[in-house]
Regions:
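ATP-binding pocket architecture of kinase catalytic cores
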Residues: 26-131
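Amphipathic, Lys/Arg-enriched alpha-helical patches that create a basic surface
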Residues: 269-288
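An alpha-helical support segment within catalytic cores of ATP-dependent transferases
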Residues: 3-19, 122-175, 180, 185, ...
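Glycine-rich, phosphate-binding/catalytic loops in enzymes
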Residues: 64-65, 108, 189-190, 207-209
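Conserved N-terminal boundary motif of the eukaryotic protein kinase catalytic domain
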Residues: 19-26
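Active-site activation/catalytic loop segments of kinase-like enzymes and analogous catalytic loops
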Residues: 203-232, 242-261, 273-278
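Activation segment
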Residues: 53, 97, 189, 197-199, ...
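Active-site acidic catalytic loop and adjacent metal/ATP-binding pocket
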Residues: 34-40, 47-48, 159-204
Length: 288
């Protein structure tokens, strides 16, 4: 079944309308694995998400829904109007705007910083901790692939975590604050896709911003702090980007295992290797 027809069918069921009442407008920019489409039903525009293959392995949908309810009053997200915790299918009010990946982000760094600070400085408590080490352990069970290089880097990361970060304060983090999850609206930047939200050190969200090019995260860090970051602060961002590289290494390996490279015409094995090399590079930079 073609994607637009599938979206039409699922959205009609979710909104309890006829399929012909669902107008499929276009696919949204963003993640490769999920299907997220811009649709219209009886004159109202929405986004509708269908989870891709294995997508629910990596996310607890009940926790995602709880966090969406918790952050609702902050006004950072588009309004969720339908959520199925079993399938992960979700509908939300459509927010007109420009995805940050499609424009030069530099003029918007202050707005990005303010958006993250609004979340980090809120008194809100997320539904769960991000569970860094436990998350890596879980993701490994989906691949059973732990190369010597991966295990060495993971152990080095855990050692650094226990020595320098384990007891640092945590805040409500989005945990996937990359530019593809940010939309420049008329009066604000919207932070979308809260699948991974939870307690974490604020540096984690800064690190996520460097998913295309790591140095972008260091630019955001200076704006966030309102001054030039110290070497230790820069290394904290590198530390969490190193974790993210190890995490996405395992996710990419899983996608390769289940045949998504062929389905999506993208080399996830190459991506997994790229993430592992990034983790190695960042660790060497931290150690100087």
């Amino acid at each position: 079944m073609e994607h637009s027809k599938l979206i039409q069918e699922r959205a009609a069921k979710a909104f309890q309308v006829k399929e012909e009442d669902v107008k499929v407008l276009n696919r949204m920019l963003g993640g490769m694995s999920h299907l997220t489409y811009h649709i219209e039903i009886k004159g109202i525009e929405y986004t509708f998400r269908i989870i891709g293959k294995d997508g629910n392995l990596f996310v607890d949908r009940k926790t995602e829904l709880k966090n969406l309810e918790i952050i609702k009053d902050l006004g950072l997200n588009n309004e969720t109007v339908y959520f199925d915790v079993e399938t992960g299918e979700k509908a939300a009010k459509f927010v007109p705007g420009v995805v940050l990946t499609t424009v030069d982000f530099h003029p918007h760094l202050k707005d990005v910083s303010d958006t993250l600070k609004k979340l980090h400085h809120s008194s809100l408590k997320p539904a769960s901790d991000y569970g860094l080490i436990e998350r890596l352990d879980l993701y490994e069970t989906y691949t059973n692939i732990r190369s010597d290089k991966y295990l060495e880097l993971k152990n080095n990361w855990i050692k650094l975590y226990n020595e320098e970060h384990k007891n640092m304060p945590k805040v409500f983090c989005h945990n996937d604050a990359q530019r593809s999850n940010m939309v420049i609206g008329e009066n604000q930047i919207y932070l979308l896709d809260w699948e991974y939200a939870g307690w974490n050190e604020f540096y984690y969200d800064i690190a996520s911003f460097g998913n295309v090019q790591f140095e972008d995260a260091l630019e955001l860090l200076d704006v966030y702090l309102g001054r030039k970051a110290s070497l230790n602060e820069q290394n904290s961002v590198k530390f969490y980007r190193m974790f993210q590289a190890l995490q996405w290494h395992q996710v990419a390996l899983r996608k390769e295992m289940v045949g998504l490279s062929e389905v999506l015409h993208f080399d996830f094995k190459m991506l997994a290797d790229k993430y592992l090399n990034l983790a190695d590079r960042l660790y060497n930079e931290i150690k100087g």
